[in-house]
A protein has these predicted regions:
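Glycine/serine-rich phosphate-binding loop and adjoining beta1-alpha1 elements at the start
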Residues: 84-182
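Active-site-proximal beta-alpha loop/turn segments in soluble metabolic enzymes
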Residues: 66, 156, 202
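Glycine-rich phosphate/diphosphate-binding loop of Rossmann-like nucleotide-binding domains
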Residues: 171-224
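Short, well-ordered alpha-helical scaffold segments within catalytic/effector domains
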Residues: 25, 29, 164-171, 195-196
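Solvent-exposed alpha-helical segments within well-ordered globular domains of core cellular machineries
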Residues: 33, 72, 99, 120-123, ...
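A glycine-rich (often HGG/GG-containing) alpha/beta subdomain
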Residues: 1-110
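Gly/Ser/Thr-rich helix-start
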Residues: 8, 115, 193
Length: 224
């Protein structure tokens, strides 16, 4: 019986590869069902953000076989040859998988240590898997404990003190270079959560003009 975490992140892969392996939210229910079919049962949660794509799973089969099945699922689902993504994958088994989830949820493994978004992202991933009934008692207890540990870390340390996010740090850097953004034009690429956070940070700093570039005009208009 094994608990595993298989995935890649900003530590191990390029943004281009993470985008190829990304699971858009609307595809995750179908992906979870397909993964569960491939595993012949078991439990799984898919966490997919701009900085990481990870699958957490629990099954009666041994951890090595479980990782093999998850690897095969990722390649099949995204139609990407193993040679193009497997070298960037990490595989954590047993206690290592548990420790990895705790570090990720507490933002200790984030691009910006202490950022608050990851806790919500992990919670959303867990709730979506729960809605699809791909979570068992073991994964449920594991994730609930991870949420508790993450909140304890934020409460008992100053890891999240101040404005801690990639968006806020990027805007702070711009201010440190240009001093005043009132007469500046800034382009934001993408209208996802990161783009939205950046937009809010820029508006709070009094930026003069914002250009929003996005594949979908409709989504860009909603954010605008």
């Amino acid at each position: 019986m094994g608990v595993v975490a298989v995935g890649l992140s900003h530590h191990t892969s390029s943004l281009a590869l993470r985008e190829r392996l990304h699971f858009p939210p609307e595809t995750i229910p179908a992906a979870l069902r397909e993964l569960q079919n491939r595993l012949h049962g078991g439990a799984a949660v898919i966490l997919s953000t701009c900085n990481r794509v990870e699958i957490y799973a629990h099954h009666e089969k041994d951890a090595v076989a479980l990782c093999d099945d998850i690897r095969a699922f990722i390649g099949c689902w995204h139609r990407i040859p193993d040679s193009e993504f497997v070298p960037s994958l990490y595989e954590h088994k047993g206690p290592e998988a548990v420790g990895h989830l705790f570090r990720v949820t507490a933002s200790l493994d984030s691009l910006v240590v202490g950022e608050a978004q990851i806790l919500g992202q992990v919670h959303e991933a867990f709730m979506l898997a729960q809605d699809q009934q791909t979570v068992d008692k073991v994964l449920s207890a594991l994730f609930q404990r991870a949420f508790s540990v993450a909140k304890q870390v934020r409460t008992e340390t100053r890891i999240g003190a101040g404005k801690v996010s990639v968006a806020s740090i990027a805007v702070d850097l711009a201010v440190s270079i240009f001093i005043d953004l009132a007469d500046k034009t800034v382009m934001i690429v993408g209208s996802g959560k990161m783009g939205e956070s950046t937009l809010k940070s820029l508006l709070a700093r009094g930026v003069g003009r914002i250009l929003l570039v996005n594949r979908s005009a409709e989504k860009a208009l909603v954010l605008a």
